[in-house]
């Protein structure tokens, strides 16, 4: 009887260890994916920040590689340029890394849906407000250029607005998303205030 109990215990222990090993491998794989994503962000050509500098009073709207240059944070020209994911993010445990990746995904989906479903109508309203009508092509470029900068802004706010321990993840994700959405609106407003006449739609035809 004793031998059977020991044998059963050892089998259960071995099963538990194997499950934990699998879980650790999954976490390591997710951590590598996060590190790869961070490295990719650092290797990007900085969204031509050196040229645009996110200062809309100096902004010249130009096409570089087929895109427009829309700065997501005109009031803080150094925030994106100085943002380094690897240096700003402290060394945290794998579980926290996993939670951070999940939050990032939630926020990204929230803002991406906002850009797809709400911004086109908001952009049209702002065009009327600033008397700066865009044609469909330039309107598309504006939204897509902002979409490319979305991850940088999310990382920026996640590094500066820490999640409180008792804050539900969904509430924190919504809070960060709202900050990014406000940046989007400000960027569009500044863009429309300084848009060159040649980029405006032919509304008088």
Swiss-Prot record:
Coiled-coil regions listed: none
Q: What induces it?
A: Expression is sigma K-dependent and negatively regulated by GerE.
Report the gene name: gerPC
- Please name the GO terms of the biological process aspect recorded for this protein, alphabetically: sporulation resulting in formation of a cellular spore
The role this protein plays is:
Required for the formation of functionally normal spores. Could be involved in the establishment of normal spore coat structure and/or permeability, which allows the access of germinants to their receptor.
Protein name (Swiss-Prot/TrEMBL): Probable spore germination protein GerPC
- Which keywords accompany this UniProt record? Germination, Sporulation
Q: Which organism is it from?
A: Bacillus subtilis (strain 168)
Question: Can you tell me where the transmembrane regions are?
Answer: none
Enumerate the InterPro entries for this protein. Spore_germination_GerPC (IPR019673)
